[in-house]
C-alpha cells in the first residue's frame, strides 16, 4: 500500500507553510502527513524529523528546508517547511522553493505577529499566487469573539498586501490536537486539505509557456553550422522553428532551428527541463556566446534597469562583514550571464546591513534579457553576497 504514493498520475503542486515563529507551522505539516497517512495517501512524518531540516545550497546560499510529500484524493503535493525565519526569507527570495500556493498559519492565541506580516509581504513580492489560512490553537481560546477578532485582523492584513482578504478561506483547528489523534481536529485537517485542493490553483506548467533557453556553450560542427547548448527553461522547440537570440547589449539576432540534439541524438523537439543543443541556421560562432538567451520571437527583451527584492547574506553565511551604501557595484548573475550593476537604495535608506531583506533599484552596465520574476545571485570578489528577484522592469 505505501508504495502507491509515488505514482505521478495526479497534478503536482508545490506548497509550503508560512507564518510567525511558534505558531505551529511544523506541527501542522506533521499533522497533515499523519491524517493523510491514515488514508494511505502519505507517509506520516514526526515533528522532529521535519523540524530537523537538512541544509541545502541555492545560488551559493545555505538554507535549512524540510521537504515533505503527500497526496490528497485529487493532487500530489511537495510541501516545504523551514525551521527558522531567516530560512524562509532566503528560501523565498532565492526561489529555492518555488511555491504555487501557501498555507499561512496564525495562532489564535496571538493573532497576526511581525513575521506573519513579513511572510505575507514576501509571498506577495515573490509572486506566491494563492494563500489559504489555518488558524491554529483554537482549542486554547475559550472566547468566540477573540476568534472573530483574529479573523478580521488576518483578513485586513491580507488585503493590505493585495491578497483577496475578503474571500481567502480561513480554517480553524488545532494542529497538535490532530497530531495527537483527536477526531474533531483531524476532521479540520481534512477540511484544510480539501480547501487547499479547491482554492490553490494549478500553475501554468513551464512546458506550456513560450520557448526560452539560456545559452551555456557554443561550438561549431564542421559542415553543419553553429550549435548552442543549454537547458530549456520554458516551452518547447521544434526543428524549423524561428527564434530570437538576445542579450549582452547587442541587437537581437534571428535564426531558424535546423536541428535539436540531446545526448548526441537527433530529436524532433526539446521541452522545458531538457539539456539540448540547437543547430542554428546562418549564425556564426563569433556572433553568440554564453549568457545570451534563445527565445520564441518577441517573447523576451533586453533591459538594464529594474526594481528588485534582495536578501544580503550575513557574515556567518559567508557574506559581507560590513554594510554597503548607495551605488554599490557588485556582479549580478542572471541565468548563465554575469554583469556588473549598480544598486540604488530607495526610501532615503543610507546603508544595507548583512542579513537585510530590502527593495532596491538596479542598473546593469549593459542590457540583458530579463523578465519580471527572474531570480539572480549577487556576487563580489568571487563569493555570493546576496540573492534577489526582479520585481518590476523600469527600462
From Swiss-Prot:
InterPro entries: EF-Tu_GTP-bd (IPR041709), EF-Tu_GTPase (IPR050055), EFTu-like_2 (IPR004161), EFTU_2 (IPR033720), G_TR_CS (IPR031157), P-loop_NTPase (IPR027417), Small_GTP-bd (IPR005225), T_Tr_GTP-bd_dom (IPR000795). One of its GO terms (molecular function) is translation elongation factor activity. It is an enzyme of class 3 (hydrolase). Its EC number is 3.6.5.3. It catalyses: GTP + H2O = GDP + phosphate + H(+). Mg(2+) binds at residue 26. Its main location: cytoplasm. It is found in: Cytoplasm. Residues 60-64 are annotated as: G2. Residues 174-176 are annotated as: G5. Gene3D superfamilies: P-loop containing nucleotide triphosphate hydrolases, Translation factors. PROSITE patterns: G_TR_1 (PS00301), G_TR_2 (PS51722). One of its GO terms (cellular component) is cytosol. Residues 136-139 are annotated as: G4. Residues 81-84 are annotated as: G3. Residues 19-26 are annotated as: G1. Residues 10-204 form the tr-type G domain. GTP binds at residues 19-26, 81-85, 136-139. Pfam families: GTP_EFTU, GTP_EFTU_D2, GTP_EFTU_D3. Keywords: Cytoplasm, Elongation factor, GTP-binding, Hydrolase, Magnesium, Metal-binding, Nucleotide-binding, Protein biosynthesis. GTP hydrolase that promotes the GTP-dependent binding of aminoacyl-tRNA to the A-site of ribosomes during protein biosynthesis. Monomer. Belongs to the TRAFAC class translation factor GTPase superfamily. Classic translation factor GTPase family. EF-Tu/EF-1A subfamily. This is Elongation factor Tu. It comes from Karelsulcia muelleri (strain GWSS). The lineage of its organism: Bacteria, Pseudomonadati, Bacteroidota, Flavobacteriia, Flavobacteriales. The gene is tuf.
